[in-house]
């Protein structure tokens, strides 16, 4: 088991957010690559015509998750980032 798994296993709570990321249609491939380079981030769907991604991010640390969300705004070609969903799963230990 690696360190990431140990940290996640011992986490007291887990946060999941859903984002809509709008980008320049000419830069979608680079935006997608940059998004997928962020740990615990996935792209369930993409509308290439509108230049919009549905992005799911997860973390056991809400501050780290906020940093990840803020970093998306700095990706070249990103126009707008909207938070559309947040869930916190608290573990009872």
UniProtKB/Swiss-Prot annotation:
Keywords: Chaperone, Cytoplasm. It is found in: Cytoplasm. It comes from the Bacteria. The keyword Disulfide bond does not apply. The keyword Cell wall biogenesis/degradation does not apply. Interacts with the cytoplasmic NapA precursor. This is Chaperone NapD. It comes from Haemophilus influenzae (strain ATCC 51907 / DSM 11121 / KW20 / Rd).
């Amino acid at each position: 088991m690696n360190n990431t798994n140990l940290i996640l296993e011992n986490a007291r709570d887990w946060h999941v957010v859903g984002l809509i990321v709008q980008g320049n249609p000419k830069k979608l491939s680079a935006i997608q690559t940059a998004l997928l380079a962020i740990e615990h981030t996935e792209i369930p769907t993409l509308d290439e015509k509108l230049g919009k991604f549905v992005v799911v991010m997860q973390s056991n640390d809400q501050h780290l998750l906020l940093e990840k969300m803020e970093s998306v705004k700095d990706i070249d070609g990103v126009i707008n980032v909207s938070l559309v969903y947040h869930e916190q799963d608290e573990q009872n230990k």
